[in-house]
């Protein structure tokens, strides 16, 4: 029983870190709700939040996140981004993204074109260079911030 309680506490802490706790509590049976194997009874955003929670439970030293905020609305993107920020804290993380909001706070951003690194730096450094990242950022993101 003690071990089960530790696992439950760890899962709940991970869900809170991932911003999944609120929607989980609103599921028919809360944390005891059975999900379909392919997650079709959840929204895309809810599936993303659960993926972040699962990663938090696994506690890996390195994360690889591939398009973590794709296919979700802007409101949910904020929840996912906040959850990812909590998950990434203190870890080496590789983020593959087209939505530049996902990488803006990264220590190092690498811009790839046809499989080659064409620019590298922080957000501010890349903006100052006024290269490809700058054009992508001002064209795709600046109007939304």
Please annotate each region the language model reported:
Residues 3, 11-20, 30-130:
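ABC-family ATPase nucleotide-binding domain "signature/switch" substructure
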């Amino acid at each position: 029983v003690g071990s089960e309680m530790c696992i439950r506490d760890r899962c709940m802490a991970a869900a809170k870190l991932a911003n999944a706790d609120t929607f989980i509590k609103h599921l028919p049976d809360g944390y005891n709700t059975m999900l379909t194997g392919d997650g079709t009874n959840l929204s895309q955003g809810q599936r993303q939040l659960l993926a972040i929670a699962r990663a938090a439970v696994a506690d890996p030293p390195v994360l690889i996140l591939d398009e973590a905020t794709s296919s979700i609305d802007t409101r949910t993107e904020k929840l996912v981004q906040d959850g990812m920020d909590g998950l990434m804290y203190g870890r080496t993380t590789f983020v593959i993204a087209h939505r530049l909001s996902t990488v803006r706070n990264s220590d190092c951003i690498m811009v790839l074109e046809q499989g080659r690194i064409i620019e590298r730096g922080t957000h501010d450094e890349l903006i100052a260079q006024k290269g490809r990242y700058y054009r992508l950022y001002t064209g795709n993101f600046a109007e939304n911030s």
